Swiss-Prot record:
GO biological process, one term: iron ion transmembrane transport
Keyword Transport: yes
This protein's name: Divalent metal cation transporter MntH
Keyword check for DNA-binding: no
Primary localization: membrane
Length: 444
């Protein structure tokens, strides 16, 4: 199958996919300055990056920073580099074939395998949504005094926001997401400046150490960070939304589109690296440095920030960034859920039904755990959701790497051998870390 055939053959399938009318809806200039083409492709990478700084990251980063200082910064860096490689492969698949990852699985695997992969991916989305419900509910409580249980229920109405944005076009959706990302960036930039962490200690934290693997608690948090950073549904999402660009569906056009799409996602994920590292650095500089190694809950961190930093604004900025993170994650998770369901099952539900169904499943355990165990229970549930996400990663990564290394499917954009080897190493690292976690859990 040639590259042209690979991309054109599935057009009918893609037309009924998760993008609907948004496919090839964003124009791309064929001439002019390079920055005009870069701006045209700017967007999908930032939507994907939302998943790399959602409320689930906050819990694992806060726990890691307060308990182990700057030690786990190396894990954040590693997971971010892994994300850059995997998201680049995801964009490559979508641009080369015109299929998203879910559609490629449906085309290549037996029905039973597809149903299993779909079920696993839906569990990942629910785990992600669980983190968003908890994070947004906590932010509403911190800012407005709304009880956690009520805040969790209120999050169900976010479907209205998603529908309004989608009706205004894909660029409006991207602009909204980027605006909230800038708010998060500004909030943490100010907080880091207030905390004034020691530069040498921060830089030293990016150097990997054996303690990350030998200490079971550090490993548990490390896997949680990887699960919170490299999210399974993001691989499905990215392979779909890169197709919103109206680039020429030719070999030359696809190669150019891939270059700009990878640039977009790489820059966006470096942005996410700053946010994730900032959360951990803040916890290490403010809590760990003063002997508070027990800070694992977002509410606890919020309460301690102002008195320990001596600036009341710090806690408010923390809560505002958390709310922006929760809202942003809602938008992208809704889109990812639609893409996954339609790609695997060819089942198209109205977005509001799809969103209420997923959010309803996520709200129930939050309400029950909050009622039975209080706020401490929701904090543990938040970290657990990120470990669950990490356990499901191989089921998205392995099919992706197999597809992008298949010349018959990918044509001229087949991934080079060196890139495939790196991707398999990443897949092996994820699998080994998960097996180590299961072993330690069984022993303890």
């Amino acid at each position: 199958m040639s590259a042209d055939t690979a991309a054109s053959a599935p057009s009918s399938t893609t037309a009924i996919g998760g993008l609907g009318d948004h496919q090839a809806s964003v124009s791309v200039p064929n001439s002019g300055h390079w920055w005009s083409r870069l701006l045209a492709f700017l967007g999908p990478g930032y939507m994907v990056s939302v998943g790399y700084m959602d409320p689930g990251n906050w819990a694992t980063d806060l726990a890691g920073g307060s308990q182990f200082g700057y030690l786990l910064l190396s894990v954040i860096l590693l997971s971010n580099l892994m994300a850059i490689v995997l998201q680049g492969l995801s964009a490559r698949l979508g641009i080369a074939t015109g299929l998203d990852l879910a559609q490629a699985c449906r085309a290549r695997y037996p029905r039973g395998v597809n149903l299993a992969l779909w079920g696993i991916c839906e569990l990942a989305i629910i785990a992600c949504d669980l983190a968003e419900v908890i994070g947004t509910a906590i932010a509403l409580k911190l800012l407005f005094g709304i009880p956690l249980t009520m805040g969790a229920i209120i999050t169900a109405v976010d479907v209205v926001l998603v529908l309004l944005l989608m009706n205004r076009g894909f660029r409006a959706l991207e602009a909204f997401v980027i605006a909230l990302l800038l708010i998060i960036f500004a909030c943490f930039g100010i907080q880091i400046a207030l905390a004034a962490p020691p530069i040498a200690a921060v830089l030293g934290g990016f150097i990997p150490r054996a303690q990350v693997v030998t200490d079971p608690q550090a490993l548990y948090l490390a896997i949680g960070i990887i699960g919170a950073t490299v999210m399974p549904h993001n691989l499905y999402l990215h392979s779909s939304i890169v197709q919103t660009r109206a680039y020429p569906r030719t070999d030359v056009g696809r190669k150019s589109a891939l270059r700009w799409a990878v640039t977009d996602s790489t820059v966006a994920l470096m942005f996410a690296l700053f946010i994730n590292a900032s959360i951990l650095i803040l916890a290490a500089a403010v809590f760990h440095a003063q002997g508070r190694t027990d800070v694992q809950e977002i509410e606890q961190a919020h309460a301690l920030l102002a008195p320990m930093l001596g600036v009341g604004l710090a806690s408010t900025l923390f809560a505002v960034a958390l709310l922006a993170s929760g809202i942003n994650s809602t938008v992208t998770a809704t889109l990812a859920g639609q893409i996954v369901m339609e790609g695997f099952l060819q089942l198209r539900l109205p977005p509001w039904i799809r969103r209420l169904l997923t959010r309803g499943i996520a709200i129930v355990p939050v309400v029950i755990v909050t009622w039975l165990y209080g706020e401490a229970g929701t904090a543990r549930l938040l970290v657990l959701s990120q470990v669950v996400l990490s356990m499901q990663l191989p089921f998205a990564v392995i099919p992706l790497v197999r597809f992008v290394s298949d010349r018959q499917l990918m044509g001229a954009l087949v991934a080079p051998a060196w890139l495939v080897r790196i991707a398999w190493v990443i897949a092996a690292v994820i699998v080994c870390l998960n097996l180590k976690l299961l072993w330690d859990t069984a022993l303890h």
